[in-house]
Amino acid sequence: MLSDIEIAKQARLKDIRDIAKFLDIPEDMLKPYGRYIAKVDHRYLNTLNAKPNGKLILVTAITPTPAGEGKTTTSIGLSMALNRIGKKSIVTLREPSLGPVFGVKGGAAGGGYSQVLPMEDINLHFTGDIHAVTTAHNLIAAMIDAHINHGNELGIDLRKIYWKRAMDMNDRALREIVIALGGSANGYPREDGFLITAASEIMAVLCLAKDLTDLKRRIGEIVIAQGKNGLVRVKDIQAEGAAAALLKDAINPNLVQTIENTPAFVHGGPFANIAHGTNTLIATKLALKLSDYVVTEAGFAADLGAQKFLDFVAPTGGLFVDAVVIVASIRAMKYHGGVSKDNLNEENVDAVIKGLENLKVHIENMKKYGVPVVVALNRFSTDTEKEIEAVLKNSPAKCVLNEAYAKGSEGAIELAKAVVETIENVPSNYKPLVPSDLPVEQKIELIAKEIYRAGKVIYTDTAKSKLSMLKKNGFGNYPVIIAKTQNSISDDPKKINAPSGYEFTVRDFQISAGAGFVVALAGEIMLMPGLPKAPAAVNIDIDENGEITGLF
């Protein structure tokens, strides 16, 4: 089979204005970036209030192997297949971060015959949204140090500055640094660090904002430090207007197309552990007005991205979820069944059946939200017929084989039919699991016990102290985003399959006041990844004609 980039180069793309015309987007609402990419004015959404929403399909996954289980590929394939069977569909996705593109994971534009295009542009810089977020983030950082240098009127405590610098790259050397060395002209020396842009609260805020006014308000509410009179916010250093100005184009959704010319919005990219892990609300809401079926995905597995989408994102945006698709793979179930990563390509039906427990937990969890569930078994070339049969026979929810990677929409037709049939015959009774008025501790306990299957929640002394501070400052009933490992349902990455009855430990809290949630930290969360020994970057090249190779 050809590589992803070779397949992409064979695709016959339509002019982006034709894609917009298919969606009835007026040309004066379009800002083309070349022939195949365009931004859609976010204000266009306000003109569509009278139109009914389409159906919203949330794609999530079982607890993944390090290589991932093909969530994006499945989302794209499902949307293409829905169009193929006569349903108008749009797929909405997050933008790829350059860090993973050059690191282990590679790009985030799908794969095989299920891609969004042009993949080189989407994976490398795209329309500059992530760079705009980086610049807005670092403007705030620069203004903090300028304020301190010029008298520090707010009495900012140099030991309690929460706002680091940001960069869209994996660079472990920048996690912990010392700045302002070289004399008094350079400011006050202090400890600082970098996080990857996808982990910036600016990214989370961009993905939740309704419009520029809301974006500016949210940026202003971001807590950046402790000062002599309590918490210091961005608005206290008067940086919200300039930061929002840097994002005036980034707030507009990016319209592209799939390999089969299905419309796609690729917009925003917050982490699914430290933040909510899905594309912008503006893009999803616009897609719901322009199509019959919207396919969107949430980061990592159902215990992370889907839980956050169903308990926080959908209520925040006033969204109704009509169905959940859980992406599963034979190799992931073998992994959860005890097979080592080196032996995942060998047939092992017993391990598959044992690993089905992980899938069952995620299905049970999603049904607690009142949404119907369909399982997409993402086929890989190493899967055997016996292994596939074992999953199809033993899955506790409707399970359909998905071959979009190898066959495009043709390989996802049965999945599309199953999803449509489910939506038409099993009405969704979607309701968030976590009531919005509960105190933070009760929200954490509910999520930990119902979704993570923990027996007890314990707090470190640091977490208890920070929780007290949260309550004192009015955050005691805020929505909660739990940041934990993606490699286990639990807070311990070594606990594979379906652990239960364990102690779930909250070690610290962070405030994301602009985004509108508090983050409960469970386990070590890496906000600035590092490159591996053999990064994907070593395989990426460009020739004298500008042809890029090695992207995946």
UniProtKB/Swiss-Prot annotation:
Matching Pfam families: FTHFS (PF01268)
E.C. number: 6.3.4.3
Gene Ontology MF terms in the entry: ATP binding; formate-tetrahydrofolate ligase activity
Biological pathway: One-carbon metabolism; tetrahydrofolate interconversion
Signal peptide annotation: none
Catalytic activity annotation: (6S)-5,6,7,8-tetrahydrofolate + formate + ATP = (6R)-10-formyltetrahydrofolate + ADP + phosphate
Residues that coordinate or bind ATP: 65-72
Keywords: ATP-binding, Ligase, Nucleotide-binding, One-carbon metabolism
GO biological process: tetrahydrofolate interconversion
Keyword NAD (UniProt): no
Family: Belongs to the formate--tetrahydrofolate ligase family.
Name the UniProt record assigns to this protein: Formate--tetrahydrofolate ligase
Taxonomic lineage: Bacteria, Thermotogati, Thermotogota, Thermotogae, Thermotogales
